[in-house]
Every structure is written in structure tokens, then in C-alpha cells.
A protein has these predicted regions:
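Short beta-strand elements at the ligand-binding edges of bilobed clamshell
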Residues: 38-49
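Hinge/cleft segment of the Venus flytrap/periplasmic-binding protein
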Residues: 47-95
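Residue-level detector of short coil/turn "hinge" positions at structural boundaries
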Residues: 15, 43, 68-70
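Conserved beta-strand segments of alpha/beta enzyme cores
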Residues: 22, 42-43, 78
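Hydrophobic alpha-helical
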Residues: 1-34
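Structured segments of extracytoplasmic/periplasmic soluble domains
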Residues: 7-14, 35, 39, 58-66
Length: 95
């Protein structure tokens, strides 16, 4: 995302809350959360790679008309919005 933001900045294209381009990320590192808090991003959510294969299986089952009988959570994932994120969120959840 840093590269994308640098390209937008270089092209003088505004990004973030109320601007030309909506920016979303899925890593929740401290830098990204600080950018979110500053309004330069719109949303950032945690995305745990350990859940990817499980989620892929669920998608395939649903596409085949199957139902999911139980819910498995490997880790709770958080999502943060630029209008509600706090410094406490950055400190507690930024990696």
C-alpha cells in the first residue's frame, strides 16, 4: 500500500476520507493504522493468513450449494474505520 499511496501522491491524486480515492488495507501494521487515523486511508482490517485455506474451503462449499455446519475461528480479526479508530486501537492492534 505504501507504493500505491506514493504513486497517488506523486500524481497529486487525493486519497482517504472524503477524497478522490478510497484506500483500504488488510494488514493492520502500525504505519497503516496511523495513516488510517490521519484520514489518509478509509479502512484497514486484519487478515490472518492461517485462515485462508479454511475460508477457501467454505467458499467452495457454498458455491456448490452445501451448508456450513460449524464455525471455526482461528483468531478474531479486527476491522478499523478512519472515522472511529483511536490511538488505543493503533497501540493495541498494530503489528
Amino acid at each position: 500500500a505504501k507504493g500505491a499511496l506514493a504513486a497517488l501522491d506523486k500524481a497529486n491524486i487525493s486519497h482517504g476520507v472524503g477524497k478522490d480515492v478510497i484506500v483500504m488495507g488488510f494488514d493492520c501494521n502500525k504505519w497503516a493504522l496511523e495513516e488510517l487515523k490521519a484520514g489518509n486511508w478509509n479502512y484497514d482490517g486484519q487478515c490472518n493468513p492461517f485462515q485462508a485455506s479454511y475460508i477457501d474451503d467454505i467458499i467452495k462449499k457454498l458455491e456448490n450449494g452445501e451448508t456450513i455446519s460449524e464455525k471455526t475461528i482461528i483468531m478474531d480479526e479486527k476491522g478499523f474505520d478512519a472515522t472511529t479508530i483511536t490511538q488505543e486501537d493503533v497501540d493495541n492492534y498494530g503489528i
